[in-house]
Amino acid sequence: MVNTLYNNNNGNNNIINNNNNNGFNNINNGQNLHRLENGHNNNIANSNNINNNNNISGNIVNNNNNNNNNNSNNNNNNNNNNNNNNNNNSNNSNNSNNINNIISSDGRRRGSINKSNMLTHSNLSNNLKIRNKLANQIDNEEKRQHILGKNLIKLTNMGIGPNNNNHNNHQNNNNSNNNNNNNNNNNNNNNNNNNNNNNNNNNNNNNNNNNNNNNNNNLVINNNKNNYINYNNGGNNYGNNTPVNYIHNNSTPRPRHSSLRTNLSDEEDSVLYSSDDSEESDYEEEEKKHLKYANRNFSGVLNNNNNINNNNMNNNINYNFNNNNNNVNNVNINNNNNNNSSNNNNNNSNNNNQLYNNHNNGNPNFYINNNNNNSNNIGHNNNNNNNNVNNNNISNNNNLNNFNNYNYNNNNNNNNNNNNNNNNNNNNNNNNNNNNNNNNNNNNNNNNNNNNNNNNNNNNNNNNNNNNNNNNNNNENYVGSSLSNSADNTESSKWRIYPSTRARQRSIASEEDSLGSRRSSLGSANDIPNSYPISPTKQQLLHYGMQSPVYSPPNNLSPLSSPYLHHNSNNNSNNGGGNSNNNNTNFNYGGNIGLERPKTSPLSYGERDPPHVINHDRRLKTPSFIDDINENNLQQSQHQHQQQQQQPQSQQQPFYSPYQSPPSSSHGNRPKTPKIISTPEGYIISSDDGSRLVVSPPNTSISSLSSMVDDNHHNQPPLVPNFSSFQQQQQLRQLQQQQLHQQQLLQQQQQQQQQQQQVPTHQQQSQSRPQTPIYLSQQQPQNPIDLMSNRRLNSAQNMKLSVSSPQLGRDVNSSNNNKNISNNNNNNNNNNNNNNNNNNNNNNKNNNINNNSEPKKPKFPLEDEKLDRDQLINEYKESSLRLDLFVNSLDEYDQQQRDISDIDNYIYNLCLCNNLEKHDSKEDEMLFDPNL
């Protein structure tokens, strides 16, 4: 359906348009309302579903904007929030009256339509077909034009246009698109009425946050007076018992509101909108067809109400998010949060019930929202009560965002803005908790204070140290965990788990930026349409298995059932085995998703290959028998070589090369599992114990080799090549191998001594295996830092410094640190000691590097800066970032540009088709303007 696709697009722009009056949301909802008879309430529900996630992410984006914006902006938000929270209930009810009448497809009034931001496009093709049929039956040109809808549609300044990049506008916070939140934030103290009217397009919503009321406007399809379905956010006027047929009841009153009157004469108006059915037989006949279609779709019960309540939840979440970020900057938020908590309490009953229904609908977003919203609503109440300690809200943000769209983006945006904007969140939170820089630590502290928070606080309390350290590592070191509580989740969540093909605005930022000050170079997180699913990397697919793009979540919360639930389990129970996952997330391979290496990788990230792989590469001309021949066989050859030197030639023992078979009396046991080895001289069939080796000619086929294996097992004489100088060559090779082996032993001993001198005591105690020598760099770092944790903070900086300076090189003990951390996850106290010390030190160092030394890092688009594709490629080449991340991010960047241009062109063409012109939203013009 065009509607569904457009709803998805609008869902995208919801994030943008939460800041921008939710212009697209209003468009979608208005369109869907416009086509109520066509049974597209499901599309409304779909757009609401998208809007739910988008509202959360959009508000989180706004929070990030608030964090990025001046404190004055946040103060404005707080002022707005104070007014909004006091008026939320009334505003919701008022919003229910904002869309008083709905215009049906036949052109008759179904009530008043909201004056602005209402692009009545829904199912434009079907709609225009119906209108054309109806218009062809009318002689009066004005009536025909009215029915055709050419004077029904008017675009206000919704930030849509042929060349208008909503994402960039959202990033820049300077465009008219951002008038809604940013202008409100900037201008609400001066122009609450104007901005709110422009943003909300409702005289009723002067006091509301534009996000909240715009979301309400999107949901308010409601007309209690006109007996239409009440989609009121705050009201109880609708329910699962509302029959859809009620919409189409002919007895429904059709008041003609003066605000939407056309300029038709009274006579013409009475003819066109007469309630006399005798003059409307053509319309009624056409209407019945669509009513039949609509009734077939709806079966008399609206489950859409559930989705709509999710939007209410998201509005509450949006309130809390805005208040959280505002709390970070302002004390006024206590009142706001209390008011919001009251709203959350009002909506909790509705939203919880509806969220369960959404879970039944099989939408993973809603299921996640169930966890998030239920926990968050309860958490919101606690958090709102404790909003002075903003960290609870932040922890909720972590959980919520993680649950919501893999909005790791949101988590890391919130957490990263909290961590990066140590000025705002962390400093303020550090004012509350002077011990740690990280929000998650603060969250854990707050969680310790607030054990009543359902999932976030209790689970964070269960994992206090795990989440502290992991979130510290995830937030500041961005351990690209999709599943841990933070992980840049912002953009790192590169999994497209939903059907939509669109990724976030700057997926590039995702893993690299998630924690580090790199976020500051990205500008606000507004550029990330988090509602959009994220495509999985190949490693992720291998790690989790190829999952269907869309699936309904299982009924249980098995942490292994899906990434969602895995993620839920991290936040909900014991981090869903989140101890090891978070540790893996932080250290082993940068995320439960296997961003660095699969969990079963024998080498943890950064650990260098064992020496035999380096010194005895199979590509060397010398046959690499050390890997394949048993040690005692090597010792035997050494012993024989010594005898050769000591004894006279006549008494010299025969030397058996590895290619030859020693006398049958020398190898008691028969070989067990022969294997074939390729060498420059040919193939070798060797047994596990290395006692019996056979050389085949170089041109021997594999089939003949298999027969040789059988021959060896049957004690048949081995095939020995007749090489004249072969034994001499083998002797030289064995001498070389002996020398290499001795050198290796010496090097290992020296390096182990150095390591023992340099390794801190707590690491020596925790070592569970001998250190693997590193041949690429003999010096061990004085103050080891886990490259895995540094990687995301300053990948470009650390990847360069780790080679040149010993201070930032990876300690071989890092794998041992991983073990310690897993143990520490089980033992939270140990985690605090090791992880808080190490990770906080690392975080401080990383922060110092980011803030003070300002390492060279790729430039991401700032507030007023665009980054073209070539420049993006060049920046990535210079920053020595991971190639797979770059490729993924580049592909997503291209897809974003295509999607943005498609949306803009689509709307622009739609405007052209309807003979529309873009005008200033400040003009209070009638929607029905025949002069269009």
From Swiss-Prot:
Query: In which residue ranges is the amino acid composition biased (Basic and acidic residues)?
Result: 606-617, 854-863
Q: Native species of this protein?
A: Dictyostelium discoideum
Point to the regions of Polar residues compositional bias: 242-253, 476-492, 527-540
Q: What is this protein's record name?
A: Putative uncharacterized protein DDB_G0289263
In this chain, composition skew of type Acidic residues spans 265-285
Q: Locate the compositionally biased regions of type Low complexity.
A: 41-105, 163-241, 304-475, 548-590, 635-666, 696-707, 813-853
Identify the stretch(es) annotated as Disordered: 26-120, 158-289, 304-617, 635-720, 802-863
Organism placement in taxonomy: Eukaryota, Amoebozoa, Evosea, Eumycetozoa, Dictyostelia
* Highest taxon, organism lineage: Eukaryota
